[in-house]
Curated annotation (Swiss-Prot):
<comment type="similarity">
    <text>Belongs to the UPF0756 family.</text>
</comment>
<dbReference type="InterPro" id="IPR007382">
    <property type="entry name" value="UPF0756_TM"/>
</dbReference>
<keyword id="KW-1133">Transmembrane helix</keyword>
<feature type="transmembrane region" description="Helical">
    <location>
        <begin position="138"/>
        <end position="158"/>
    </location>
</feature>
<protein>
    <recommendedName>
        <fullName>UPF0756 membrane protein PTH_1668</fullName>
    </recommendedName>
</protein>
<feature type="transmembrane region" description="Helical">
    <location>
        <begin position="61"/>
        <end position="81"/>
    </location>
</feature>
<keyword id="KW-0472">Membrane</keyword>
<dbReference type="GO" id="GO:0005886">
    <property type="term" value="C:plasma membrane"/>
</dbReference>
<feature type="transmembrane region" description="Helical">
    <location>
        <begin position="15"/>
        <end position="37"/>
    </location>
</feature>
<feature type="transmembrane region" description="Helical">
    <location>
        <begin position="117"/>
        <end position="137"/>
    </location>
</feature>
<dbReference type="Pfam" id="PF04284">
    <property type="entry name" value="DUF441"/>
</dbReference>
<keyword id="KW-0812">Transmembrane</keyword>
<keyword id="KW-1003">Cell membrane</keyword>
Amino acid sequence: MSTNFFFAFESSEMILITLLFLGLFGRSNLVVSSSCILLCLKYFKLDQLVFPVLESRGLELGLVLLMLHILSPVATEKLTIKDLHSVTSLKGLFALAAGTLATKLNGDGLALMNARPEIIFGLTVGTVLGILFLRGTPCGPVMAAAVTAVFLQIASLFS
């Protein structure tokens, strides 16, 4: 066995293994699952086939799955046309405004991730830290990137 065990891996594999352990440490099943799947795809040499699709359409597929989850109460009739009146309540109006603002901010976060992919590792580590120390729930890198974009815009005001 080589004395330089870690040099047997490519740098991308080392990053994925690091993320895997951070996910285990932070009890983030999403990070663990994603890291394992990507490592398996690389191991079985499917990366050339699958990674381009994931890079170009993966976020879209993930958002479709998220929307299916969010809209499933409509399909199962747990929410009906009668529930539409709730949008006019104070809570409903706040939710409407928050959804609109969050969509704008998420767009900024997505643009930031596309322009600066090097922030993704920091977003992932920050997510794990939030789970561990703030008892947070991982909501995905797009929202974390949106907050990062806001922080960067605020910082640019002072520079």
